[in-house]
Structures are given as C-alpha cells and as structure tokens.
Amino acid sequence: MMQFYRKDLSNEALTELYKKLLLPRMIEEKMLVLLRQGKISKWFSGIGQEAIAVGATMAMQQDEWIMPLHRNLGVFTSRKMPLSKLFMQWQGAQEGYSKGRERSFHFGNSEHHICGMISHLGPQLAIADGVALA
C-alpha cells in the first residue's frame, strides 16, 4: 500500500497543488474532444503525466528556465500562461505565441522562463544541461 507523507505541506498547499494538477487534465480532455471534432489538427495528449510536469515546475523558482516537451501541458499552466493565448496557439491563430506559424508546443516564452522544445526529444537534454551550467 502506498503511503503519503505530507511533511510540512498545509491543507491549503495541497489543495493548490491538486488544482494545478486538475487544470491540465481538464484542458487535455477538452483538446481530445476538439481533435475528434476536427477543430484542431493535432494534439499530443499528456493525460496521466500531469504530476510530472506540475511537480517539476512547482519545485522550481519562477525565474528558473524549464525545458518542457510536447506532453508537458502542466508546465505551461503552472507558470500561469494565459489560457486564451495558449488556445490561440493551438489553433494556429496569429495571436498565439508563434504568431500562427505552428499549432503545438514548439514555442517558448521568456516572460515565463519556458524554453521552446525541439521535435527530436533527445537534444532537449543538451540544452537543459547548458542552461543548468550557465
């Protein structure tokens, strides 16, 4: 049986963490509906991986750079990126982060200290190593 040790986390902190886990799951579920309806062209679902993205992001300071991958929606929501602009990004709108050039997670945002991802997943590690050493 798995044991949970809350250590020094208050009820409020645990509730906030749960909300941060729930938001990307709700968005993921909606995006899969939109994909099936043909309203978006692609979606790389991260359902079941929310705790990885949210936990890693919450363990970092807001001014530390993070290098997410395409299934790490929780990074973007935990860094409080505006949902309206995220949805414009995924729809390829001019108002999205990449100004309509693509509809995925390949964008970064310096304001939120998020590095844009590379399609080939392995090379992202070298970038993270360089940032950590800088």
Which sequence ranges carry the predicted segments?
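Cofactor-binding active-site loop characterized by glycine-rich and histidine/acidic residues
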Residues: E29-A134
